[in-house]
């Protein structure tokens, strides 16, 4: 289905559009008749200019801001008039902001007649379709109809792999279609919203430019050619990476999809409904707003705090009227809140105090030493709550306790030294600080100076494998996490609530035995007294409280129910508003890149089966190594200064990583001093370095054999001499030598004939007679049966032969990536076909089950509930690790005066629970169980002149296809996976770790807080929270808690599998897999198409071939060169192949003439390479005496393994046989002489 899509983009079958501009021809071709004459051309030109010149179209919009004032006249109750000119000034600036740039104007001009809207059933534009190269193309995920009378009726061909569909463009529209290009060098390109940057193989745009509804828009170069088609985007902090469709030089479509991509098809709007009491209303159109009714607006937010459309409701609450701009300010949400006073542990670095800039919390999860601070003051607002970039506001700790303001220059942040303020919003500051044991935020103004210090260790952080104090100017960029400085980002929510009543003695005055309630100017206060009877009231001016004679009999407080305050443990929760709201936590932790140093590259000295790394660094740098065989033996060491490290390297290879350099893999060659084809001492020297044990055994055995042979030969010669010196006695009693006497004992023998044998069987054993007689008869019967079945077999075989369209070839390929396996397919009646199979990549894909995710927790301590002269009771709550406790006898007196009348009956309900940290979305770990693993390999198969790439599962069942080729692989010879049953994934690194089961949490251990996903509501935790009794000096919630198990695990997690996996596996995630593991062998069955074979009559026939090896160096590379001299009957292509595993040829096919010679290169690991080579099926033997390589260490793995018969050179065998032959000859000669002497001297009477 996709093949037509490729061909459509690759062949360019349609002519390019002409240079002449013909505006909006597509809209006039079908519905209207063609106009003739000069008037028609002038009208078309006028229409095109008015539609395309955007700058002229925007200028007449200046007088249009007149309608809004008409609506404002309907509400004459609002007295302040200065508010009217402010929106007019803003609207005057709108045309300047929306004026398109040069790139945008060019894109709009080119899109006018070539880009079509795609609409849904409601008529909303949800995407776009593009006319290009004779086709109309539309993203597949854009479900709608093209807004064109002709194009909407076309039949589209779908390509799900590339998320595109296309149809033939009508002939009368083809000349105006876009053309595409596969050339897109790095730089900037044009699209509907301005400039698009192409760098590092990705298209990116500034954040906030483009979004839903832009799917299908083209990205064009300066010539107007389409470079890519936009499908979606992925938010990456300050920029957005685009998901696009591009084309390579061959016209093949390439889809690029960044991680986290969202499709940019405008989804239909679904209006969410919110509640207020029993009345429902659209969340984007609440019945009131905060400016009109602050208290009711907060009621609406609190009642819908858990609604999915809470953000939409919050946005609508913050603006009044539907006629205004739909886009709100990014800093106006904290106008709902108020600063407050809180208890600071260390004010002015000395003692506790009630501070207007109390530090609530400090986050230091970023990798660039940036911290996020939450305080009780608010930044970016003036005292009225309006957004002001250079101001902050705080709650005054003077008697009036009013909100005051100051300039941001008065705010100072420090740790062990001053910090650099990066950004601020609401309660939050973002700063980059040096390491220290505490964080201090201070207000240093001319009127007053105050500070708050929080004990918090800010440790020096670094990313990568090299420690540094300051980031370098030049180096290498690697992934890291930083706090986003943009104020629009959100890391989650912070809980808010209405403030409770706090009593202040400054609101009471005692004079002449009377008590007066004295409210601040323009404020209301409420007093409660126990002067015999209970008395209460709310006053706005100085008022006497009758019947009371002492201040301690009364409390007075003010309570503002039109503002939220942070859910701080230093504030009392209001009794009438226990519900909570929430606001966004700014400065989200996002993935980014950080500049890190790169240490000096090590000076590597290669030796025989070892390397020496001469290291020199002025900062701590990590050196890790692992072997690439079955036993990785990983090592880890932090190094500083000058040093030398030595490592042994074998044939399997060694990988070392020095600092932030890329991993380096080295392999040992079988290099050694001496000469395997030289004199004996050179042979012994060579093999002693390669195989010391066997060489020592061989030399010792030869020496022992020589000594034994010489000794036995000498002894036998002495014995023979002594026995043979005595002559025979010619006496009457002479004896015959034993050797002659033995000859007389030899008896003659002859075989019986067949007739005699059968006669014997007939007379003595008739059953054996019949058995012997039936043997020839059985042979005749079997032969006749075979001849009778031969003809039907050939008929059946001939019937099926015509249906076979492929030839099956089975082989076994080593699972070593990038090492080709070569074979020669010999089929009767056809010329030999060369076959090359290369495992390009392999993946071990385990089936996984995520048990839970865990991360650092945040302890939420809500504002306590305080009840005077009574008791409270805890209620169950649906929070993780929720703890509640009621304490009595609290707060008889507080800062500023009496809070409760009673001395011991007062009670406080303290609560605490945990939540996932605000930065959990970026910094969390996945606990995963691993089950049965599958294996998938990417194969490159070359047969004849055809090359195919395909992916196939190695299970022996699932076939893989590529064009006419069918492959079945597996099962692999040995099952293997580097993963244990339980693994943990953290920031792309994989660890084998036996984590606790889901629901079995333990405080201070990995998994102390668990959730099935980052957005799920099933959070469970066990952190050992223990609430303590508060002291009477101020409102607070003391508690103790276990440390974060996630943080403890991060500090003791060990090395990841990426650095310790055996067989050189590369570990990857999303999905979890092990890549390019070199182990085992893969059986492969290939169905080769018949068209790939050439009949013998059509292929060159080589009659003679001779091999001469001109040069040979055994190594990992192709160090051998051989010349094949041949005689052929015609010119053509011939496959050349090595039939021995001793050597691998580099060439697969050579061009032959009628007579000549070709040179081939081969690789071997043996000093004596004797291998059979075939040229067009004609075989010959190449004998090569190879020399050892000069390089001891190489960067490529070996292509051949050593074989025993080729591991020892022919010269070595000759010398060895000579040594053993000399010793055995001496031994045999000695024994022969001894035997002869014994036979001649021993006599027999």
Curated annotation (Swiss-Prot):
UniProt GO MF annotations: RNA binding; serine-type endopeptidase activity; structural molecule activity
Q: Name one Pfam family in it.
A: Peptidase_S3
What is the designated name of this protein?
Structural polyprotein
Q: Which residues lie on this side of the membrane: Extracellular?
A: 329-690, 752-763, 807-1214
Q: What is known of its domains?
A: Structural polyprotein: As soon as the capsid protein has been autocleaved, an internal uncleaved signal peptide directs the remaining polyprotein to the endoplasmic reticulum.
Q: Which residues form the Peptidase S3 domain?
A: 114-264
- Residue ranges of the region described as Host transcription inhibition: 37-70
Site (Involved in dimerization of the capsid protein) at 189, 222
Report the residue ranges where the short sequence motif Nuclear export signal is annotated in this entry.
146-156
């Amino acid at each position: 289905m996709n093949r037509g899509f490729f061909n459509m983009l690759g062949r360019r079958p349609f002519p390019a559009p002409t240079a002449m501009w013909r505006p909006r021809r597509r809209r006039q071709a079908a519905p209207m008749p063609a106009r003739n004459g000069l008037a028609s051309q002038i009208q078309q030109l006028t229409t095109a200019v008015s539609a395309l010149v955007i700058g002229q179209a925007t200028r007449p919009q200046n007088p249009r801001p007149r309608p809004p004032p008409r609506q404002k006249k309907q509400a004459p109750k609002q007295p302040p008039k200065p508010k009217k000119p402010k929106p007019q000034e803003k609207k005057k600036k709108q045309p300047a902001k929306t004026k398109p740039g040069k790139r945008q104007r060019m894109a709009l001009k080119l899109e006018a007649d070539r880009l079509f809207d795609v609409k849904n059933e409601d008529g909303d534009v949800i995407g776009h379709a593009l006319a290009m190269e004779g086709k109309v193309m539309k993203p597949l995920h854009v479900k709608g109809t093209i807004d064109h009378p002709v194009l909407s009726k076309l039949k589209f061909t779908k390509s799900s792999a590339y998320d595109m569909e296309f149809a033939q463009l009508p002939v009368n529209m083809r000349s105006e279609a876009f053309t595409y290009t596969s050339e897109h060098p790095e730089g900037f390109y044009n699209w509907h919203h301005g400039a698009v940057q192409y760098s590092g193989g990705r298209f990116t745009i500034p954040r906030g430019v483009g979004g839903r509804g832009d799917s299908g828009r083209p990205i064009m170069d300066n010539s107007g050619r389409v470079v890519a088609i936009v499908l979606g985007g992925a938010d990456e902090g300050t920029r957005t990476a685009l998901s696009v469709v591009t084309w390579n030089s061959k016209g093949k479509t390439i889809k690029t999809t960044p991680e986290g991509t969202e499709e940019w098809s405008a989804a239909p709007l679904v209006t969410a409904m919110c509640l207020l009491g029993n009345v429902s209303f659209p969340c984007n159109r609440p019945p009131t707003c905060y400016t009109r009714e602050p208290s009711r607006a907060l009621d609406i937010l609190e009642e819908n705090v858990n609604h999915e459309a809470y953000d939409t409701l919050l946005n609508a609450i913050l603006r009044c009227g539907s006629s205004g701009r739909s886009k709100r300010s990014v800093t106006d949400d904290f106008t709902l809140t108020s600063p407050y006073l809180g208890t600071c542990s260390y004010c002015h670095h000395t003692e506790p105090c009630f501070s207007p800039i109390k530090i609530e919390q400090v986050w230091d999860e970023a990798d660039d030493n940036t911290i996020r601070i939450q305080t009780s003051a608010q930044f970016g607002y003036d005292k009225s709550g309006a957004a002001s970039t250079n101001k902050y506001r705080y709650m005054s700790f003077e008697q009036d306790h009013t909100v005051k303001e100051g300039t941001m220059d008065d705010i100072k942040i420090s740790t062990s030294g001053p910090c650099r303020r990066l950004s601020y919003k609401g309660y939050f500051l973002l700063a980059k600080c040096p390491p220290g044991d505490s964080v201090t935020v201070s207000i240093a103004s001319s009127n007053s100076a105050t500070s708050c210090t929080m004990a918090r260790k800010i440790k020096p952080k670094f990313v990568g494998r090299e420690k540094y104090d300051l980031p370098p100017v030049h180096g290498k960029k690697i992934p890291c996490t930083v706090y986003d400085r943009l104020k629009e980002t959100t890391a989650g929510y912070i809980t808010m609530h209405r403030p409770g009543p706090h009593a202040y003695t400054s609101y009471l005055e005692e004079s002449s035995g009377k008590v007066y309630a004295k409210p601040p100017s323009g404020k209301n206060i409420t007093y409660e007294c126990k002067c015999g009877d209970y008395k209460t009231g709310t006053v706005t001016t100085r008022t006497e409280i009758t019947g009371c004679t002492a201040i301690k009999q009364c409390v007075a407080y003010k309570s503002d129910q039109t503002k939220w305050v942070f859910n701080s443990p230093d504030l009392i929760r209001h009794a009438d508003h226990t519900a909570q709201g929430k606001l966004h936590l700014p400065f989200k932790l996002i993935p980014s890149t950080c500049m890190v140093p790169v240490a000096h590259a090590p000076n590597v000295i290669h030796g025989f089966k070892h390397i020496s790394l001469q290291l020199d660094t002025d900062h701590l740098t990590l050196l890790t190594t692992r072997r690439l065989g079955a036993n990785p033996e990983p090592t880890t060491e932090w190094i500083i200064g000058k040093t030398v490290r030595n490592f042994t390297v074998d044939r399997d290879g060694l990988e070392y990583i020095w600092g932030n350099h890329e991993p380096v893999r080295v392999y040992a060659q079988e290099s050694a001093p001496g000469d395997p084809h030289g004199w004996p001492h050179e042979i012994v020297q060579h093999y002693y370095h390669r195989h010391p044990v066997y060489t020592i055994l061989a030399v010792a055995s030869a020496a022992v054999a020589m000594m034994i042979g010489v000794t036995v030969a000498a002894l036998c010669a002495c014995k023979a001499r002594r026995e043979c010196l005595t002559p025979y006695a010619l006496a009457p009693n002479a004896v015959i030598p034993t050797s002659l006497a033995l000859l007389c004992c030899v008896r003659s023998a002859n075989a019986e004939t067949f007739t005699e044998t059968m006669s014997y069987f007939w007379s003595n054993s008739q059953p054996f007679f019949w058995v012997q007689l039936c043997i020839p008869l059985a042979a005749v019967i079997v032969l006749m049966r075979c001849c009778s079945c031969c003809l039907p077999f050939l008929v059946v075989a001939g019937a099926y032969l015509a249906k076979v369209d492929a030839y099956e070839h089975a082989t076994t390929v080593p699972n070593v990536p990038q090492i080709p396996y070569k074979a020669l397919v010999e089929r009767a009646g056809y010329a030999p076909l060369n076959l090359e199979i290369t495992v390009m990549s392999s993946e071990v894909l385990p089936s996984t089950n995520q048990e839970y995710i865990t991360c650092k927790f945040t302890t939420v301590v809500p504002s306590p509930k305080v009840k005077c002269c009574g008791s409270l009771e805890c209620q169950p709550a649906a929070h993780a690790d929720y703890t509640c406790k009621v304490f009595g006898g609290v707060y008889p007196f507080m800062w500023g005066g009496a809070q409760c009348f009673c001395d011991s009956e007062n009670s406080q309900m303290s609560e605490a629970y945990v939540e996932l940290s605000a930065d959990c979305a970026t910094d969390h770990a996945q606990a995963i169980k691993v089950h049965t693993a599958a294996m998938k390999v990417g194969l490159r198969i070359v047969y004849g002149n055809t090359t195919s790439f395909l992916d196939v599962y190695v299970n022996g069942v699932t076939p893989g296809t590529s064009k006419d080729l069918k492959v079945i692989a597996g099962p692999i010879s040995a099952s293997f996976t580097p993963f244990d049953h339980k693994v943990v994934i953290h920031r792309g690194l994989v660890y084998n770790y036996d984590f606790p089961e889901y629901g079995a949490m333990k405080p201070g251990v990995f998994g102390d807080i668990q959730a099935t996903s980052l957005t799920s509501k099933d959070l469970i935790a066990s952190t050992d929270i223990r609430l303590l009794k508060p002291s009477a000096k101020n409102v607070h919630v003391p508690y103790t808690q276990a440390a974060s198990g996630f943080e403890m695990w991060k500090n003791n997690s060990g090395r990841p599998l990426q650095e310790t996996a055996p067989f050189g596996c590369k570990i990857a995630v999303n999905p979890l897999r092990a890549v390019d593991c070199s182990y085992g062998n893969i059986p492969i069955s290939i169905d080769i198409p018949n068209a790939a074979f050439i009949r013998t009559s059509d292929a060159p026939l080589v009659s003679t071939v001779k091999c001469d090896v001109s040069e040979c160096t055994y190594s990992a590379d192709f160090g051998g060169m051989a010349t094949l001299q041949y005689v052929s009957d015609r010119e053509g292509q011939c496959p050349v192949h090595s039939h021995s595993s001793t050597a691998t040829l580099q060439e697969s096919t050579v061009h032959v003439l009628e007579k000549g010679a070709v040179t081939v290169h081969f690789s071997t690991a043996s000093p004596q390479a004797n291998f059979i080579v075939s040229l067009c099926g004609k075989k010959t033997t190449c004998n090569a005496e190879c020399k050892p390589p000069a390089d001891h260490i190489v960067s490529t793995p070996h292509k051949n393994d050593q074989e025993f018969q080729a591991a020892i050179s022919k010269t070595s065998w000759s010398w060895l046989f000579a040594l053993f032959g000399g010793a055995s000859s001496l031994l045999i000669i000695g024994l022969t002489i001894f035997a002869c002497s014994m036979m001649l001297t021993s006599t027999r009477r």
